[in-house]
Amino acid sequence: MKNELICYKQMPVWTKDNLPQMFQEKHNTKVGTWGKLTVLKGKLKFYELTENGDVIAEHIFTPESHIPFVEPQAWHRVEALSDDLECTLGFYCKKEDYFSKKYNTTAIHGDVVDAAKIISPCKVLDLGCGQGRNSLYLSLLGYDVTSWDHNENSIAFLNETKEKENLNISTALYDINAANIQENYDFIVSTVVFMFLNRERVPSIIKNMKEHTNVGGYNLIVAAMSTDDVPCPLPFSFTFAENELKEYYKDWEFLEYNENMGELHKTDENGNRIKMKFATMLARKK
């Protein structure tokens, strides 16, 4: 597990004189964040605390110490034990949280994280990639990623981020309604995109996606629905009806198919995330 952690923020080297006060008082790491202390010189005392500030355990760390990660949300504080102290702190997270923590992007779609556990690195098209939350993660895992979106600002952000992270992602401005994928891919991803497409173009778009997926390859679609029991609360240009997406892919093998309630990141007038029904499908081409 710890081998899967990646550093998203490294603090400067601190001495006894500039060790931040907040770290010398009771504090904890965020959800999904592990702390990695490194003592370069001198001695540092580390206190494990309860939420009330009671000491559970004390440790003295030196450059020779094998210092374990500070677990997420674990209460602790530190204290300089020598005048020559030099230490630093790195913040670590799982790969799926890396870009959201480092760049404050929207979290990677959970179905993409799940799909990556069963689909080995391959040639991927992220169709309607937005700022690249899914593309960046898949590239980090070693997939050969192509990312298309119609929004210039989103593609510009993705290009800037991939350069900073030294990731090889091919990007382009693209109107999905054109249904003009020309190369073949092993995995085509489209999460929360179909609701912005032209209704009359959807059959052509899906046909084009299916035709340009290699045999044995996968399509992952997460899309808004509107059904009699749960009408879509927002005026999207397209929503799937009950079993409509399933019907489009009836000649493929379904690894996952469900039509469940979900939430948008968008909130209503009371600040609550908008709830609606989504079709989620991971299918393999026979």
Curated annotation (Swiss-Prot):
Native source organism of the sequence: Haemophilus influenzae (strain ATCC 51907 / DSM 11121 / KW20 / Rd)
Family membership: Belongs to the TehB family.
Binding site residues for S-adenosyl-L-methionine: 128, 133, 149, 175-176, 191
GO cellular component term, pick one: cytoplasm
Protein role: Probable S-adenosyl-L-methionine-dependent methyltransferase. Plays a role in both resistance to oxidative damage and heme uptake/utilization. Also protects H.influenzae from tellurite exposure in vitro; however, since H.influenzae grows only in humans, it is unlikely to encounter tellurite in its natural environment, and it is thus probable that tellurite resistance does not represent a biologically relevant role of TehB.
Top enzyme class: transferase
Organism classification: Bacteria, Pseudomonadati, Pseudomonadota, Gammaproteobacteria, Pasteurellales
Key words, A-Z: Methyltransferase, S-adenosyl-L-methionine, Transferase
Name of the protein in its database record: Probable S-adenosyl-L-methionine-dependent methyltransferase TehB
Pfam families xrefs: DUF1971 (PF09313), TehB (PF03848)
